[in-house]
Design a protein with these regions (language model features):
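A short beta-loop-alpha structural element at the N-terminal edge
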Residues: 3-19
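Helix-loop element at the rim of GNAT/NAT acetyltransferase active sites that forms part
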Residues: 19-35
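Active-site rim helix/loop that mediates acceptor-substrate recognition in acyltransferases
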Residues: 30-59
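Conserved acyl-donor/pantetheine-binding loop and adjacent beta-alpha core of acyl/acetyltransferases
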Residues: 57, 63-89
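C-terminal "cap" of GNAT-fold acetyltransferases
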Residues: 82-85, 125-130, 136-138, 144-156
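A short, internal acetyl-CoA/4′-phosphopantetheine-binding micro-motif in the GNAT/acyltransferase core
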Residues: 87-98, 125
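Conserved acetyl-CoA-binding loop-helix of GNAT-fold acetyltransferases
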Residues: 98-113, 136-137
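Conserved GNAT acetyl-CoA-binding A-motif
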Residues: 113-126
Length: 156
């Protein structure tokens, strides 16, 4: 197995990030008859102020990514806190999950957000999802719960 390299993402990575959204929401998508394409607002029109992505590669191939984006209150993400707090998404392809790549991505993205001057990051996670302990271990704290979905926030 080769070493994982984390690099800055750009517009050329958007098809990969878009494909990762199916994995991010796939663990509960079975409850729906069709895949909810409204989640694509997490990557559509990439390059706006406040967009930042990191891509994890292994042997030159992308295996995961983490990114954050600001959302307006009129079109919030699932983990929306306020218009000044970017919402984070972290996804590792299934074949590489459980190997610490997600933790590396979260740590690196927290550093990126702090360097960019943001006071916090938020994230949405389903209660009981494997990422919940990882996020709490990185200092994310619950700010809201709706049904089985948690909104977590990490001050930077």
């Amino acid at each position: 197995m080769t070493d994982v390299v984390i690099r800055r993402g750009d517009k050329l990575d958007m098809p990969f990030l878009r494909s990762l959204l199916a994995f991010a929401y796939g663990w509960h998508v079975a409850a729906f008859d069709t895949f909810d394409t409204s989640i694509y607002h997490y990557v559509d029109t990439w390059g706006r102020d406040g967009d930042s992505a990191l891509v994890a590669t292994e042997g030159g191939h992308p295996v995961g990514a983490a990114w954050f984006r600001l959302f307006p209150a009129t079109r919030p993400g699932f983990g929306f806190v306020d218009e000044e707090t970017p919402e984070m998404t972290v996804v590792v392809i299934p074949a590489r999950q459980g190997q610490g790549i997600g933790q590396q991505l979260v740590s690196a993205l927290l550093e990126r957000a702090k360097a960019d001057g943001y006071p916090a990051l938020s994230v949405s996670v389903q209660r009981g999802h494997a990422d919940e302990p990882l996020l709490r271990g990185q200092g994310f704290e619950q700010v809201r719960e709706e049904r089985d979905t948690l909104t977590l926030r990490r001050a930077l």
